[in-house]
Amino acid sequence: MAICRVDTVSIPVSDQNQALQFYRDVLGFELIRDHAESQQTRWVQLVPKGAETTISLVKPFAGMEAGGVQGLVVQTYDIQSTHQELTGRGVALSEIITMMEGRFATFNDPDGNGWVLIESTGSMLA
């Protein structure tokens, strides 16, 4: 057996339409799939441009609550301009800090799921 990659990370959200608007229109993720199996089951899957790992915006289920995911990391090549652009789109980001061969800022989605925006300044993510 060999696990070869992380395919999809489920993000629990209280309102899939609001979350879709945030991830697609504010963060710029690409919508891959939006399929409603029934009124209770909807699969909303997005991906950052150029990435392989996707996210799925899911209604919370047993053991999962909206806003309960923390420490998700996305990478940028220019944290300063990305920080300014996202701030201009209404995202509340922390100040940029530098440590461990990288520059970081944090933010939350509308449900409180926590993200880290990183720009590698060394071999940290090589």
What are these regions (language model features)?
Residues K49-T54, G63-M64, I79-S81:
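Short, charged/polar surface micro-motifs in flexible loops or helix N-caps
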Residues M1-C4, T8-I11, I32-H35, R42, ...:
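Vicinal oxygen chelate
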Residues V6-T8, G67-L72:
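Eukaryotic phosphotyrosine signaling hubs
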Residues D15, D78, D109:
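Acidic di-acidic motifs
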Residues A62-A66, S123-A126:
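A short local loop/turn or secondary-structure capping micro-motif enriched for an aromatic residue
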Residues I55-V58, W115-V116:
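Conserved beta-strand in the GNAT
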Residues S10-E52:
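Core segments of cupin and vicinal oxygen chelate
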Residues G71-Q75, I79-H83:
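Mid-chain, well-packed structural core segment of small domains
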